[in-house]
Amino acid sequence: MNAAPTVLQQQAQSLSEAVTQPIPGSRKIFVQGSRADLQVPMREIALTRTPTLFGGEENPPLSVYDTSGPYTDPRVAIDLAAGLAPLRAQWIAERGDTVALDGLSSSFGRGREHDVRLDAVRFPARRLPRVARQGANVTQMHYARRGIITPEMEYVAIRENQRLEAVTDASLRRQHPGQAFGASIQQRITPEFVREEIARGRAILPNNINHPESEPMIIGRNFLTKINANIGNSAVSSGIAEEVEKLVWSIRWGGDTVMDLSTGKHIHETREWIIRNSPVPIGTVPIYQALEKVDGRAEALTWEIFRDTLIEQAEQGVDYFTIHAGVLLRYVPLTAQRVTGIVSRGGSIMAKWCLAHHKENFLYTHFEDICQIMKAYDVAFSLGDGLRPGCIADANDAAQFGELETLGELTKLAWKHDVQTMIEGPGHVPMQLIKENMDKQLRECGEAPFYTLGPLTTDIAPGYDHITSAIGAAMIGWFGTAMLCYVTPKEHLGLPNRQDVRDGIMAYKIAAHAADLAKGHPGAQVRDNALSKARFEFRWDDQFHLGLDPEKAKEFHDQTLPKDAHKLAHFCSMCGPHFCSMKITQDVRDYAAEHGMSEAQALSTGMQEKSAQFVAQGAQVYRAT
C-alpha cells in the first residue's frame, strides 16, 4: 500500500473521534429477520423511571429508525481505507444472475486505474465490479414483478415498522387521525406490501449490485418520508477527506440517502471513497462529470461520453442517477420570460447543448439505451427537473409542467424495462401552489415517487433557506412526496460546511416527521408522546435523548442551568421555578389528590378560597403594603 491512502486515513481518524460515538442516550440494536444474515439496525433510546411524584412507573426503551450505519456502533472498528463490510454480497451472489468482471468496462475508469499520478488519492482496496448476466435484469422492480420477495424487501419492511409492536403503552400509541390524500397507509408494513409497491412503481429500493455495503431502504409515499443530503467537492473548495466526513456526518443526523454532486477534480476517486464507506444509497448527476471530460463545454458533449460515464459510475456502485432527459428543445424558449431562467445546472447544460446543435436532447433520444445500462446494475432513475422554477414568480409555469409531462412519458418507458424510477420536483413554489404540483405529478407520472428540493416558499431569506424550504417540504411531504432533498442555510450563498449540513438535515427531519404525522403513518406519534410525557415529568435527560438532536437540546438547556442538579429540577430557565405551567398543573393535581377531589374541583375550590381572601382584605383592587 502506498503512503497517500494512509494520509487520508490519518485525516479520517479525527472523523472517527468527532462523529462515531453513539448518539447520546442510545445504543445500536439489530432486529433479526428470517435468515441469519438479515439483521436490521435500529437505534434504541434508553429512558429513565418516572419520578415517584408522578407515579414511579418504568419507561421502556424506544426504538427509532437509524441511518448512521456502523459508525455509531462502538463494537465496530472503522477503517475507511478498507470500506464497510459488504452486507448484501451474499444475497446478490445467491440470485445467480450477475457475473464479476475482470476489470472496469469504462474507458475513463480504466485510464484512472492505471494513472500513477492518482496514487495519492486513490481508494486503496481494489474491487472488481459485477454486471447482469447476458439478457438478465437485476432490478428490484424486476424481481417484484415476478412475485419474488428479496432479502432487501424483507429488510425494509422490518426497518419501516421500527419495532412498533414493542410499544405496549396505550397512551404512547395514541395518535390523531391523519389525512393521507389517497395514499395507502398501512398499519403494519409487510414484505409482501413492499414487493407490491415496488412492482407497481409507487416505491423504489435503490440498491446497485456494486454497492453491497448499503443497508436497504425504501422511497415511496406509503412509507416513512425520507430525506436526502447533498455533499460534493467543487473546483474551489473541499477535498476527499472532507467529503467522506460530510457523508458520515450527514447519515449520523438522519440523511436517508446522500447525493455526491462533486464538480471539481478527482471526482472519480472522491466517489469511490464515498461509496465504499456509505451504508446509505448514493446518488449522482452524471452529466456533471461528463461535462468535466469535455473541459466544461456543453456543446462538446456526446452520447458516447455520457454512456461511458454512466457505466463508470454504475460499476463504482452509484444507486441512482439524476438524468435530465425531460429538457426538450421545444421547452427551452418557454423559459425566456422567466425572472430567473433555467437554474438547474443539469438543465442549463442540456439546454445549451440542444440550442448549440439545434437537436433534441440526446438523453431523451437515447433513453432506452440508458435503460439497458440501468437494469444491468440496478441503478434507479431520478428523472431530473431541469426546468424547475428558481423563484416563486416562475412557479408552475408552462416550462416546468411541460417537462413534468415528459417525465411521466419517460417513467412509463423505464417501467417497460423494469427500471426503478422516481421524479424530481421543485424548487421555489409559494404555499398555495404546492398541492397543484403534487397532484399533477401523481397524475402524469403514475404515482412514481416524488423527490423534491423543498420547495422554498419565499425568496426573501438568504441565509435561512433551510427554513423557507422546510415549510414547503412539510406541506408537499404531507401531500405525498416520498423524499425531500434538504436545503442548508448556505443555499444560494456558498458550499455548506459541516454545521450547515447538520442544520439542513435537522430542518428536513422535522419536515419529514411532520408530514408522517399529518398522513397518519402508524406509530409516527409515539416519539412525540414519549417526549411530551418526559417533559411533563421533568425527565430532562430523556427529553434530550428523545429529540432529533440530543446534543443541541442539552447544549441549550445547559447554557443557563448547567449543573447536574438542574437535570432533576421541576422548571427550566424560560419560566423559572414559580411560573412553570407544568409545575403549576402538577401542584393542582397534588392538591386534588390530597383532598380527595377532581382537578376541576380543586381549581374551583382554589378560586373560591382566593375570592374569600380578596373580600376579607377589603375588596380593594390596589392596596398599600
From Swiss-Prot:
Its cofactor is [4Fe-4S] cluster. Zn(2+) binds at residues 428, 492. InterPro entries: ThiC, ThiC-associated_dom, ThiC/Bza_core_dom, ThiC/BzaA/B. It is an enzyme of class 4 (lyase). Its EC number is 4.1.99.17. Homodimer. Belongs to the ThiC family. This is Phosphomethylpyrimidine synthase. It comes from Xanthomonas euvesicatoria pv. vesicatoria (strain 85-10) (Xanthomonas campestris pv. vesicatoria). The gene is thiC.
